[in-house]
């Protein structure tokens, strides 16, 4: 990464951490993926029950692999091919001690935006697991919450759609078609503007480009 980009991310990271803390989130800034992995593992006591959704950024940091290798009870839907077992795992995550997720976007004033297909990820952010850990690269940070919603819909969702390959317009065009398909991955949009109870949601911001 160029030094100018690193310096830019570092400066914005410092501002964002302060703004997240004003909104009662726990927040940490890590310059590298290696630092971020260490920080995430420091937040999760051994013996905890840990689950996650489709957390690409966390996977790029190495969180899921480290949790599998550690002394934790793991809830991982990707271990199953049977849809019923996958659904069971998704529901089981509501009782996890820690749920690991990413963010589709963040506003520099400390608000998080997520867009979801099934609703399990946004549902758990709102209510369920005792602790939420959000791993997010600084490429996700936008000037305003309006820009963050726009990013979630027009960048994050179409890019995620390329992973899933579902028969939605953005699969073919790369552009949001504002579809209402049964296969849409954009059925719920969640703005998390404050944390209650304080500290339940913990951000580990990474000074690199991660996820979509």
Language-model-detected regions and their locations in the chain:
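N-terminal start-of-chain detector that recognizes signal peptides
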Residues: 1-2, 21-24, 71-74, 85-87, ...
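N-terminal active-site beta-alpha-beta segment that forms phosphate/nucleotide-binding
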Residues: 9, 13-90, 95-99
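Conserved phosphate- and dinucleotide-binding cores of soluble alpha/beta proteins
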Residues: 94-212
């Amino acid at each position: 990464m160029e030094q100018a980009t690193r310096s830019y991310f570092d400066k914005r990271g410092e501002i964002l951490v302060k703004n997240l803390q004003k909104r009662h989130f726990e927040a940490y800034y890590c310059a590298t993926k290696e630092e971020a992995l260490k920080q995430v593992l420091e937040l999760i006591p051994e013996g905890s029950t840990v689950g996650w959704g489709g957390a690409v950024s966390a996977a790029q940091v190495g969180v899921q692999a480290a949790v599998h290798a550690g002394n934790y009870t793991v809830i991982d839907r990707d271990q199953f091919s049977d849809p019923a077992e996958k659904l069971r795992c998704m529901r089981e995550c509501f009782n996890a001690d820690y749920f690991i997720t990413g963010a589709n976007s963040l506003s520099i004033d400390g608000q998080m935006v997520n867009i979801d297909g099934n609703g399990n990820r946004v549902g758990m952010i709102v209510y369920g697991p005792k602790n939420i850990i959000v791993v997010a690269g600084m490429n996700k940070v936008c000037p305003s919450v309006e820009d963050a919603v726009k990013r979630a819909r027009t960048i994050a969702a179409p890019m995620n759609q390329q992973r899933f390959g579902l028969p939605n317009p953005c699969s073919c065009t790369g552009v949001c078609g504002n579809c209402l398909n049964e296969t849409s991955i954009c059925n719920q949009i969640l703005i998390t503007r404050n944390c209650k109870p304080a500290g339940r949601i913990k951000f580990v911001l990474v000074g690199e480009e991660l996820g979509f």
